[in-house]
């Protein structure tokens, strides 16, 4: 029965074959392979003998005259077909069997070529329908065979089959995503005042090919990684019928559909595209964000390096959610934040043999920077001093380091710190985190620093619109936030381009994180969080531009020698520029001046004057408070001395000369110290007035029209 499947094919005959490039020529049959129902053929090409193995289906499709001549037993239910069409009908029946399973590659046992494996009832039905159409008698057997078999199908390798399976899954996934988008599009609210814009966004999204980031995507190595995370619309935005104007079509692209209005009041969309290392849509969980951002940095601290991870964005865009964990109402699940996930991996790494032998100890600190001041969140918000020692190492005096043994210890510290972090109300948000929260995981070996991982939840970046506020405290908050974000950007710039000088003294944030920007084994990741609502479009664009600016600075490391010069003015205007900006007289002022020069598009001379006035005022405030505290302590000693003098006067024969001399000495000392303190207070009040006048000189930028 097996040899019958080969029909009239014999060893030594010539058959037509089709090459992979489409050519058809003759070749001689050299062997018949019964195990896999194929034949081996050989031919001579350019003087060389070549050969290949071809399955019977392909041979019969090109050589229909070699098909087996078996008689088909007719069905008892219908009369037998005419003899003239019997051969054609056998070919038709064979084709129907193959076509019915073409979507699923057949096994060797189920491949059907001869008629003995087909159902007998199929034959008369096919032949009778063919007779009714009058097509069988009008064509030759060869033409019918070519027509019914169609183009020859080649056997597929396992690799091709796997690729087809992956492609099928991909197409299925895209179809599901398309159906989901269409379902969302159908749920539009025609009563929405922005219905026209909503339709424009829907039509634009319909033309995109979506390929979002998945956990199967590879993790790239970056010294500076910049990514963006979009959050979903919250309940308040949904109730206000706000629109989602952010689209993330692929793993590294973010698109903003900014509504605009022409002079004739016609509304239109301005679609702006940004590209980053990674882009996370609103369905990405914290674990996925951590996998691509902070997780690659954990190993850095075990290799004696410094790692830094920032969460940056508008208030309410998801920074604290990303760093601290999921919120359920007002309660936060700290175990799902990047703080805890990083700590978990640190303790897992400690168990590896190559790190276990180092006998490393893990410590944690948690502090906040508010209006240029540093407070310890693990020690009842004690105010700390940031000083630079003789070795140019920045020391946070009084900062407590708590040793942690497991992830649960870390979660407890995070709960303690989050409970007392500073927040307030601004013109941009009713509940704004107005401080930079810095959580550090420190590795020490025999008491010496081995590595440090700094995780920073930055304050809301509402572009410092509050620098022109009537409230001084709000002004100072906004000024410090803006200055620290500018300084952070320039420090990352210096890190990415290996610059000899890093302007870390320009703000308290970068001063505290100095060791994270100095050294070859330093790595940084920035997570820019954005709100999807149309009402937040301006702040979202500002966040993306800031992140894009940071990424631009590190896109082409080979162009480090072609860095834009700091000075953008001809040499003969340097003196005028020095006059305009003023001459720095301290390291802090020099770095601030350098910072403003490198960001002239964002920082005007008036704004630089304001920042300078704020810095001077903050320094004087610290000095006045410190002197006042010293005077208070001295006053306690004065009271004791005066009490002793008064007790001496109660004696009958006390020494009047001694009493007068001692009292005069106490009064002179009081006058000298209090006069000095009074002069400093006067200077401090003058600095307050100067800051207020400088704030009035700032030209507020006009908001971008929607």
Curated annotation (Swiss-Prot):
The modification Phosphothreonine is found at residues 78, 97. GO terms for biological process: cell differentiation; cell division; microtubule cytoskeleton organization; microtubule depolymerization; microtubule-based movement; mitotic spindle assembly; mitotic spindle organization; nervous system development. InterPro entries: KIF2A-like_N, Kinesin-like_fam, Kinesin_motor_CS, Kinesin_motor_dom, Kinesin_motor_dom_sf, P-loop_NTPase. Residues 223-553 form the Kinesin motor domain. GO terms for cellular component: centriolar subdistal appendage; centriole; centrosome; ciliary basal body; cytoplasm; cytosol; kinesin complex; membrane. It is found in: Cytoplasm; Cytoplasm, Cytoskeleton, Microtubule organizing center, Centrosome; Cytoplasm, Cytoskeleton, Spindle pole; Cytoplasm, Cytoskeleton, Spindle. Residues 1-217 are annotated as: Globular. Signal peptide: none annotated. Residues 660-699 form a coiled coil. Changing residue 317 to N: In CDCBM3; results in abnormal cellular localization with predominant decoration of microtubules rather than diffuse punctiform cytoplasmic and nuclear distribution as observed for wild-type protein. Keywords: Acetylation, ATP-binding, Cell cycle, Cell division, Coiled coil, Cytoplasm, Cytoskeleton, Developmental protein, Differentiation, Disease variant, Lissencephaly, Microtubule, Mitosis, Motor protein, Neurogenesis, Nucleotide-binding, Phosphoprotein. It is linked to Cortical dysplasia, complex, with other brain malformations 3: A disorder of aberrant neuronal migration and disturbed axonal guidance. Clinical features include early-onset epilepsy, and various malformations of cortical development such as agyria, posterior or frontal pachygyria, subcortical band heterotopia, and thin corpus callosum. Interacts with AURKA and PLK1. Interacts with PSRC1. Interacts with MCRS1; the interaction enhances recruitment of KIF2A to the minus ends of spindle microtubules which promotes chromosome alignment. This is Kinesin-like protein KIF2A. It comes from Homo sapiens.
